[in-house]
Amino acid sequence: YGGALKQLSIGCASSAGKAYIHSGGKVTDQHILWENCAEQDTFLEAMADAASTVAKHFAGKIAYVAVMKNLSVDCDCCAVAEDPCMNDVGILSSLDPVALDRACIDLVRNSNDPGREHFMERVNSRHGTHTIDSAETLGIGTQAYELVKV
């Protein structure tokens, strides 16, 4: 799942930082990354750790926005990403990236969109919400939220 936490980590990282996160802290050279990729949960925990660093650096000076439009199961960094499988869900914002990502996942999970099953199968098969759990454990934020429609 590529929400606020992913953008805080992978999205803010240099090429060396991206390699470091994807390898679970083993390498910073992107040319040898693919021989050193971390196990999935280790990678997700490294994303949460990197997100924690950025969130703490900008604490009190950052807001998070999620535009849930044209949702695809593939990462935005894929060279050939699958076409979007879900219709537009909405735009969410929060001062807490953990709450924002949890709310986004919950909105998808509880939607009636015909693409929901495909989307959630991909999230679940990749342990996608493990980053949210790890980020909460690191103290970045909480998974508790209140949706306010405007």
Predicted features and spans:
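Extended, low-polarity segments enriched in aliphatic/aromatic residues
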Residues: 1-150
